[in-house]
Amino acid sequence: MSFKIVVDSCCDLTADMMKEGCFVKVPLVIRSNGSTFVDDETLDQQDLLNCMSQSEDAPSTSCPSPQSYLDAYQGVDDVYVVTLSAHLSGSHNCAEQARLLMEEDHPEVNVQVFNSCSAAAGEVAVALKILELAKSGLPFKHVVRETQQFIGRIKTLFVLETLENLRKNGRLTKLQAVITGALKIKLFMGGTPEGEICKLGQALTMKQALGKLVDKIASDPDHEGRVATICQCNCPERAQQLKANIEKKCKFADIIIVPAGGITTVYANDGGVVVSY
């Protein structure tokens, strides 16, 4: 059976991963400071970062249309779709609308839309898990069941260098934004099982916050034997150091690093790192 894995552009697959040939990326659109960025291979991350830093307003994002997803679903027997957390974006809803349209026109095609309940590194982890299962020749329903169980176990943690975009778009309370801005506090944050953002701790420096992140992972016995994905936003050296620190304290089977695309750049901003496992 032929298959493809359709992802939205917050799934930060590397160029080498895309060479597998089964991945199709459907881009979101970003608007900041009067400029529009399509989140595909043409996006210039530095231009986006500059626009965001110069703007008084939060960047806005637009999810793909149902038609964009529908176009991506064509041509195979089995379609697996991975989207941003439904709590963060309308991407999941649009992918579901496209699935219903596909069922009407091509009932013989299997389509499953997965709410990653995560973003960035978490979406990458889900997409790679689907690839592993589908390439092994498992039937569609088996791949779906295994992937749903995998999503239920995913943990996502992140530390941001700057909270400006969270402040601008209202995801931080005004008081919290003032305090963290004045003291330059670094928040150690995570995702809930439902895919919402929560605060896990704070530190005075990025190094301390990342240390808390590593300690949090090390204290979780469920991490052992898994694959960790680190997504970095314009900070490859920081990501490499984080990987080395994780390797010292944790027992992952593998740790991979991926660069942030446009949507992750909006969420994580310059210097942010996201870890999923």
Summary of predicted features, one role per range:
Residues 10, 48-56, 63-69, 74-77, ...:
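N-terminal/domain-start segments enriched in small and hydrophobic, helix-friendly residues
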Residues 7, 83, 232:
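Short beta-strand/turn micro-motifs composed of small residues
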Residues 60-67, 204-208:
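Conserved phosphate-coordination/catalytic loops
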Residues 3-62:
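N-terminal glycine-rich anion-binding loop in soluble enzyme alpha/beta folds
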Residues 10-24, 28-29, 88-91, 95-100, ...:
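Mixed-charge interfacial surface used for oligomerization/domain docking
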Residues 83, 112-113:
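A glycine-rich beta-strand to alpha-helix segment
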Residues 3, 79-81, 226-228:
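Generic beta-sheet signal
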Residues 64-104:
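Active-site cofactor/cluster-binding pocket
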